[in-house]
Regions:
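Cofactor-binding catalytic cores of oxidoreductases
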Residues: 1, 69, 153, 173-202
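Duplex nucleic acid-engaging cores and interfaces of nucleic-acid transaction enzymes
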Residues: 23
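Residue-level signal for helical boundary/lining positions with a hydrophobic bias
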Residues: 28, 58, 126-128
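Short secondary-structure capping/junction motifs at helix and strand boundaries
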Residues: 46-54, 93-98, 149, 194-196
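Extended alpha-helical targeting/anchoring segments
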Residues: 55-60, 65
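FAD-binding subdomain of flavoenzyme oxidoreductases
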Residues: 63-175, 179
Length: 202
């Protein structure tokens, strides 16, 4: 599968009118792409994966099919970024699976891929984390996000009411002063203004 390394974006008549997000962040990667190669291609476009494990030598279908997860705060494991699955189901049969509740591409694209478009939530979810038992994954359509940089910041804090609230209900309202300190440090380090928002807690 390592020779299957085509990737492309979709736009215009290839995107379902019901897809309500930014289609420039949709990318299809064939099964031979490793995460390291995907990250190189995404960086050129100013984009990043929504989730990633600690090893970037695996192929994209490998991490998705085994439910590899990262440490994103408000996002789940790698399968959650997948919105389309191109499956080889037999010697002369291919399907392109999407959720019926979340249409992304049009039949025009799947026809060009030589696959039958199937929209079914249960089938999609079954094939998503299937450990390779649902067919051969030819490629995956994924959603991405804007490129970002993570910086480690550690500080010992007492286990008080504010910390307990953050842990149990993800309410960080007791940390506004600390986040302001992080903003100031990040602004100095990066030489451009960095502002903390709820969306920053990704």
């Amino acid at each position: 599968s390592k020779n299957l390394r085509r990737f492309f974006g979709v736009s215009g008549s290839y995107v379902d009118p019901g897809y309500g997000k930014d289609s420039t962040k949709l990318l299809f990667f064939e099964c031979g792409y490793t995460l390291s190669k995907i990250n190189i291609e995404l960086k050129k476009k100013g984009l990043s994966l929504l989730a990633c494990g600690s090893n970037n030598g695996q192929t994209l279908p490998g991490v998705v099919s085994t439910n590899t997860h990262g440490s994103a705060f408000k996002f789940g494991a790698t399968p959650e970024m997948v919105v389309g699955i191109h499956l080889i189901t037999g010697p002369s049969s291919q399907v392109y699976l999407e959720r019926a509740s979340y249409p992304v591409v049009t039949k025009k694209l799947t026809d060009e891929l030589g696959a039958e478009l199937v929209r079914d939530d249960a089938l999609f979810n079954a094939a998503l984390v299937s450990f390779g038992s649902f067919g051969i994954i030819r490629g995956l359509m994924i959603e991405t996000r804007d490129l970002f940089l993570l910086h480690l910041s550690r500080k010992f804090r007492p286990f008080n009411e504010a910390l307990e609230k953050a842990i149990t209900s993800l309410d960080f309202s007791g940390f506004t002063t600390y986040f302001k300190e992080l903003e100031d440090r990040a602004t100095d380090r990066n030489q451009f203004p960095v502002t903390f928002t709820e969306e920053s807690l990704y």
